[in-house]
Amino acid sequence: MPGRPSLAGRCLRGSRRTGGMGGGGSALRVCADHRGGINWLSLSPDGRRLLTGSEDGTARLWSTADGQCCALLQGHESYVTFCHLEDEAAFTCSADCTIRKWDVRTGQCLQVFRGHTSIVNRILVADNQLFSGSYDRTARAWSVDKGQVSQEFRGHRNCVLTLAYSAPWDLPGAPCAEEAGGLLVTGSTDGTARVWQVAGGGCWQTLRGHTGAVLCLVLDTPSHTAFTGSTDATIRAWDILSGEQLRVFREHQGPVICLELVNRHVYSGSADRTVKCWLADTGERVRTFAAHGHSVSALKYHAGTSKNAIPNYSYGSKGKQSPPLNWFPESTMVSKEREREQRPAQTGYLDDALRSYCRRSRK
């Protein structure tokens, strides 16, 4: 198995845990079928299945109802870096330089996407296209059905870590948006984000301003705005059509690892062990959630249910249960925390287990 330069996190144990926040908050079940750490997880649109990608080179499908493993997806020749789950298909990418599409009912591999020459870091599925970013410094667009490359995006001087896509119809008033076939935004360890025309592969804009690697990004397509998070501890807002930097969000004390945009609010998770909430339009910080014991590597806003019981998934470290960030009426912020690996550079994070919590909103 090749060495690991990936910025994606690793787990110390290949276990997935589910538990409740009531009482002592002990785990209700432990699913330890993986033989290596869990690098990523994806929840199906209907919430009934969970997909995990592991250091052991496999992905597994789980029932969220009982925690049972529904299918083993095996075929990759190295660790799985990222995974994405839809209703009928699962997608995984790996350090073996390939992407695979799977049948979620049978576990059968339906398609192998070959073309990248180094580790594939991220994938994104939209409009019957699959987009990928790799350590080979390229991003690529593929036909989901045929597994063939339809476009290559070259220009970054270092590896591509993060992706976001906007369809032409999501860009009202954007010049030549339809001819461009939509816009792909990529973030790289070269410190830039780039905006690409999907149809032609040309670079529309280069977003320069960060002084560290761009680790995460989200798009607000109605306003043509991209938000990027970096190892320089800042979040920056950009006009993706003009390339203009609109504002800088400064308060984090460590790399910004993950972003979520909800209802004109930007949520950010950082290596400084906090999640912060910002007003997207002004950059004003309106709230800080500082209950985490380790770096926050992923977060997800989840709307509440009629019973105010929200199932959440998070990573903890060293067997410690992840504490709740806070209580939200009718909603919650799901987060995943990681402990930084002891290395000279800020390149790796270690996780211990995946847990499921039920957090009830405060009246």
Segments the model singles out, each with a brief description of its role:
Residues 59-62, 83, 99-103, 139-142, ...:
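WD40-repeat beta-propellers
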